[in-house]
Amino acid sequence: MANIKSAIKRIQIAERNRLRNKSYKSAVKTLMKKYYAAVEDYKANPSEEAKKAVDQAMSAAYSKIDKAVKCRILHRNNGARKKSQLANALKQVTTAS
């Protein structure tokens, strides 16, 4: 444990940032799972409502990923890869049907 006042403060700041980053990453993962679930629903029952749900889920996931990249919680290549995976999931469903 640190004895110097500035070192103690840095430890507190690092912990605060770790928790903030963890919540952002968790939110990104949750939105990605919701998107994949919406894509599966669309695959099982391709309808206009399902397509709208997929588009809304994609928009929410893209937005959260972009915000995480902007705050430097995710590296920009990691964010781009996640967005690419989301797009490919929908592309495979739409080209198959």
UniProtKB/Swiss-Prot annotation:
GO CC, any one term: cytosol
The UniProt record lists the keyword Ribonucleoprotein: yes
Domain of life: Bacteria
GO MF annotations in UniProt: small ribosomal subunit rRNA binding; structural constituent of ribosome
InterPro entries registered for this protein in UniProt: Ribosomal_bS20, Ribosomal_bS20_sf
Keyword Cell inner membrane set for record: no
Alphabetized HAMAP family for the sequence: Ribosomal_bS20
Family: Belongs to the bacterial ribosomal protein bS20 family.
Protein name (database record): Small ribosomal subunit protein bS20
